[in-house]
Design a protein with these regions (language model features):
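Alpha-helix capping/helix-boundary segments
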Residues: 98, 157-158
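Alpha-helix N-cap/helix-start capping motif
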Residues: 6, 155-156
């Protein structure tokens, strides 16, 4: 995700814009070992995630060094997005599986739900996961995705899912 963010930010600078990455801190992802997550993930996934998190520490250190070459907003968290809600002309959500309800605990911030009306909302190489979301999420997905001005997804099956939900082909 960091390399894709860097490349997109670099390209946007080349065309004369001043892009800034919103330094969003998703609690479910940033604090995976909270006990409330044990219930949601199950014991096996919780332990597996803990091992993966430990193995990821050296990589995260390298990523943090790389981040120094990128322009970020002040850190923000869910429910406290006001500092960035109307700051930009265009908002771009993208990379990784930002729309996979299992990985983000269906954090709607990744759908740019905090953006003030009248601002453009786009996605770039977004991924939704491999399957159509369960029935209980589909209306929410439809509403959130329908608010986007442009949607670009990474995979063909992601385009199929978005089309199934919104009747618009990315």
């Amino acid at each position: 995700a960091i390399l894709q963010s860097y490349a997109l930010q670099k390209k946007l600078r080349e065309i004369g814009t001043q892009p800034e990455i919103i330094d969003y801190r998703c609690d479910y992802i940033s604090n995976p070992f909270r006990l409330v997550n044990l219930k949601k993930k199950g014991l096996f996934n919780y332990i597996y995630g803990a091992i993966g998190h430990i193995c990821y520490i050296p990589r995260r250190f390298k990523c943090n060094k790389f981040r120094k070459h990128m322009r970020y907003s002040q850190p923000v968290t869910q429910g406290k997005m006001q500092p960035v809600a109307g700051k930009y002309d265009i908002y771009i959500a993208g990379s990784d599986q930002i729309w996979d309800y299992k990985l983000t605990n269906f954090d709607t911030t990744y759908f740019l739900d905090f953006v003030k009306e009248g601002k453009k909302k786009c996605s770039y190489a977004a991924s939704i996961g491999e399957n159509l979301p369960p029935e209980e999420y589909q209306q929410k997905y439809k509403k959130l995705l329908s608010d986007f001005d442009e949607i670009l997804v990474r995979e063909d099956y992601g385009a199929d899912i978005v089309e199934n939900l919104t009747q618009k082909r990315p």
